[in-house]
Swiss-Prot record:
This is Ephrin-A1. GO terms for cellular component: extracellular region; plasma membrane; side of membrane. It comes from Mus musculus (Mouse). The keyword Lipoprotein applies. Coiled coil: none annotated.
Length: 205
């Protein structure tokens, strides 16, 4: 019976240890002003993209930031120019949603059971860029994600403290982070413990 529950227990532990890396995707995030904004993850970690969100009516609807995000190759990342609509990963197009900011999640897993799912490899980098919806901006928002590495600290770019801005994921930026909710809730260790309990009881009999 050991060969049944031991692999499941290992899977439970690996899932419980997965980290979530949050990126606030908007032009006020000073991280996007760096030339090489990079997030380092491990396999089975999550990347949570928090879309632009406005709590009140102080910003006109036409001025609200909306983006189409693409997953692209390195050369397209450098040029900040996607080559195909097939590269669309998400749309951030609900900046005034009543429930709060949209959260879009990517799981960096080696294999996926879904036909349209993405698979990732250790030691590889993956690239995301965005294009504004309904308005034009000169700033290119782009992100590099490297699988299997440690998070490095990059100097924070200068930000005008008087500038009205959206949230940023840099902990040194004194802003209040709203909480978004994922459509795929994370499995907690307690749930796995309940699922594994019948197998452990069978072994003890």
């Amino acid at each position: 019976m050991e060969f049944l529950w031991a692999p499941l227990l290992g899977l439970c532990c690996s899932l419980a240890a997965a980290d979530r890396h949050i990126v606030f995707w908007n032009s006020s995030n000073p991280k996007f002003r760096e030339e090489d904004y990079t997030v380092h993850v491990q396999l089975n970690d999550y990347l949570d993209i928090i879309c632009p969100h406005y709590e009140d009516d102080s910003v006109a609807d036409a001025a609200m930031e909306r983006y189409t995000l693409y997953m692209v190759e390195h050369q397209e990342y450098v040029a900040c120019q996607p080559q195909s609509k097939d590269q669309v990963r998400w749309n951030c197009n609900r900046p005034s949603a009543k429930h709060g900011p949209e959260k879009l999640s990517e799981k960096f897993q080696r294999f996926t059971p879904f036909i349209l799912g993405k698979e990732f490899k250790e030691g590889h980098s993956y690239y995301y860029i965005s294009k504004p919806i309904y308005h034009q901006e000169s700033q290119c928002l782009k992100l590099k994600v490297t699988v299997n590495g440690k998070i490095t600290h990059n100097p924070q770019a200068h930000v005008n403290p008087q500038e009205k801005r959206l949230q940023a994921d840099d902990p040194e930026v004194q802003v209040l982070h709203s909480i978004g909710y994922s459509a795929a809730p994370r499995l907690f260790p307690l749930v796995w413990a309940v699922l594994l309990l019948p197998l452990l009881l069978l072994q003890s009999q």
